[in-house]
C-alpha cells in the first residue's frame, strides 16, 4: 500500500477500517425506485493458486426517480456467465434495488438472460461499443463512411424512424459487407432500446459513457498495484474509490431531469428473489 515505516499492526488496522467502511457502503440499503441501471466491467489481474488470472470487476451505477445517481454495487468474478450476473443482480435486489426499467451495458455473455430473469427490465446495448463492433466488419479505409451512415439512425426523433433508417442503411451496407448486415439484424432492437424512454434522458442512457470517468480513476489506481494478491484486496481498493466518488456525486446537482421521470410507468413492488447471494467482499 506504499506505507513504508509503518508497523504491520497499524497497516492491519488501517486495512480493517477501510474494509469496514467499504463493506458498509457496498451493502447499504437502497430505498425508492431506480429506473436506470448502468453496468460496466474493468478487467484486473489477480493471483490465484499460484497463477495470475484475469477477473472482471463489475461496477453498477443507478439513477433514482429524484434524478440522482449513485454507485449501487461492485461484484468481482472470473466469469461472465448468466449465474455470475444473476448473483450480482439478486444481491442488489436484496438490498432494495427495484423499479429498474432499463439496464445499460456492453454485450456481456449471459447478462441479457439474467436481466430478463431477475430484473424484468429492457436492455440497452452500449451504443459506443456497438459502433466499434460494427466497424470491425469494415476495412479501415471505409470505416468513416460506414460510421456516418450508421449514425443517421441515432439522430432520429423516435424509435420507428430510427429503426427504419437503420434497416435502410443495413440493406445498403450488406451488399459490400454481409457480416455487418447480419450484425445489425441481430442487434438492432438492443441498440435502439433507449428510444422507448423520455427524450430528455436519452443522451445519458444510450451508452455506458456516464461511467467512463469513474472507470478511468479505478483503472489508474489499480495500475499502481498491478497484480492483486486476492479478491479482498480488489474490493478494498476499488470499493474505496467508489465510496469517494459516490460522496462527491451527492454534492452535485441532479444528474437527470426529474420532470421526465413522471413519463415512466410506476413499478409494482418487486418481490425479493429467493436464494440470494451477497456481493463479493
Question: Could you say what each language-model-derived stretch is?
Answer:
Residues 2-3, 77, 116, 120, ...:
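Amphipathic alpha-helical interaction elements
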Residues 4-104, 109, 113, 117-121, ...:
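RNase H-like nuclease fold core
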Residues 9-16, 20, 83-90, 94, ...:
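Solvent-exposed alpha-helical segments within well-ordered globular domains of core cellular machineries
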Residues 16, 32, 70, 83-90, ...:
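Conserved phosphate-chemistry cores used by DNA topoisomerases
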Residues 33, 141-158:
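A polyampholytic, Gly/Pro-enriched intrinsically disordered region
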Residues 120-136:
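Inter-helix linker motif
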Residues 139-140, 198:
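Generic structural signal for alpha-helix starts
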Residues 152-281:
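Acidic/histidine-rich catalytic cores and adjacent linkers
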Amino acid at each position: 500500500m506504499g506505507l513504508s515505516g509503518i508497523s504491520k499492526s497499524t497497516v492491519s488496522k488501517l486495512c480493517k477500517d477501510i474494509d469496514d467502511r467499504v463493506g458498509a457502503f457496498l451493502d447499504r440499503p437502497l430505498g425508492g425506485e431506480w429506473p436506470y441501471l448502468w453496468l460496466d466491467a474493468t478487467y484486473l489481474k489477480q493471483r490465484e493458486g499460484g497463477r495470475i488470472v484475469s477477473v472482471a470487476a463489475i461496477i453498477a451505477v443507478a439513477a433514482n426517480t429524484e434524478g440522482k445517481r449513485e454507485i449501487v454495487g461492485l461484484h468481482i468474478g472470473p466469469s461472465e456467465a448468466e449465474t455470475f450476473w444473476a448473483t450480482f443482480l439478486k444481491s442488489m435486489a436484496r438490498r432494495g434495488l427495484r423499479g429498474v426499467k432499463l439496464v445499460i451495458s456492453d454485450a456481456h455473455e449471459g447478462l441479457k438472460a439474467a436481466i430478463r430473469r431477475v430484473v424484468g427490465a429492457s436492455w440497452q446495448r452500449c451504443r459506443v461499443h456497438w459502433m466499434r463492433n460494427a466497424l470491425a466488419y469494415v476495412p479501415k479505409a471505409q470505416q468513416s463512411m460506414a460510421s456516418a451512415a450508421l449514425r443517421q439512425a441515432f439522430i432520429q426523433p423516435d424509435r420507428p424512424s430510427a429503426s427504419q433508417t437503420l434497416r435502410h442503411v443495413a440493406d445498403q451496407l450488406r451488399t459490400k459487407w454481409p457480416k455487418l448486415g447480419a450484425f445489425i439484424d441481430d442487434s438492432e432492437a438492443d441498440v435502439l432500446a433507449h428510444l422507448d424512454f423520455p427524450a430528455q434522458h436519452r443522451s445519458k442512457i444510450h451508452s455506458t459513457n456516464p461511467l467512463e470517468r469513474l472507470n478511468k480513476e479505478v483503472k489508474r489506481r489499480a495500475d499502481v498495484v498491478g497484480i492483486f494478491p486476492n479478491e479482498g484486496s480488489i474490493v478494498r481498493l476499488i470499493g474505496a474509490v467508489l465510496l469517494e466518488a459516490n460522496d462527491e456525486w451527492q454534492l452535485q446537482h441532479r444528474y437527470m431531469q426529474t420532470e421526465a421521470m413522471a413519463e415512466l410507468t410506476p413499478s409494482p413492488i418487486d418481490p425479493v428473489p429467493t436464494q440470494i447471494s451477497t456481493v463479493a467482499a
